[in-house]
């Protein structure tokens, strides 16, 4: 198929998912490329429309074995037109459970055709001793190699012949969506009220006037 543009979207509060997806996308450096940072609250409120001759690569972390709720909400603003999509899940060295199958179901419902999928180990967002330092150099090399294989597959592919891409997971889903985390992040005596945390919080959970209010 003849691609005209590549989009890569990611939800990456710890920046690790972004690293993986950007390395996959680097295989398509000869194409126009645009990133969509779904970690940003305002970006998730925008509408996006994709054509049949464009490719979307979307990466999300597994939250309790499911797609993060903010991403599910954001995908309601995505509309494809038989647009090929690549699904990427990252996880903190435990399991992705139903993350990929949930992501697949959400994008199919919005007019996308899954043509590839992968999962990568990344450092756990809250327990950094789990897969600390991942993705490492070898992980990112594998991400680039995955991108190279995708590029070759898409060169030979016609989307209506793509078939039903099999991904791990079960439906109905094994676990309910993750609700509130069982802990809260709190400031300490070193807080200087710079408000950076409130500015970058993906779900606007921190007061914009007082960071101690969460």
Could you tell me what each predicted segment is?
Residues 16, 184-204, 213-214:
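Cysteine-centered iron-sulfur cluster-binding motifs in ferredoxin-type domains/subunits
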Residues 208-209:
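Short beta-strand "wing" residues that participate in macromolecule-binding interfaces
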